[in-house]
Design a protein with these regions (language model features):
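Short recognition patches in nucleic-acid-associated and regulatory proteins
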Residues: 30-41
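Broad hydrophobic/π-residue packing in well-ordered secondary structure
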Residues: 12, 35, 66-69
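Polybasic, low-complexity binding patches
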Residues: 2-3, 40-52, 59-86
Length: 86
């Protein structure tokens, strides 16, 4: 599901407010949102599939894309159920 840019940003801000720690390692430094499902250059990006991660875990997710999708999609789905009503 693609959201309008403003809706996606509102959703990301809700996630970052709700989760001040990385949802993978629970560190607090440099947290940001990561799209669990995304395609090359944004093709097939699913804005409803996002988790909050620190910079290190974000890099790990991109380096291990296949494993991270399966591992964190359930967390992303729970996030959307809780905060997806932008």
């Amino acid at each position: 599901m693609r959201l309008a840019r403003s809706e996606n940003r509102a959703y990301q801000l809700r996630l970052l407010e709700a989760y001040p720690l990385c949802q993978i390692c629970e560190r607090q430094q440099s947290i940001e949102c990561h799209h669990v499902r995304y395609g090359r250059f944004g093709a097939d990006k699913d804005d409803s599939k996002q988790i909050v991660v620190c910079r290190e875990c974000h890099q790990w997710c991109h380096a291990h894309k296949k494993g991270s999708i399966e591992k964190y999609e359930e967390v992303a789905d729970e996030n959307w159920q809780r905060f997806g009503d932008c």
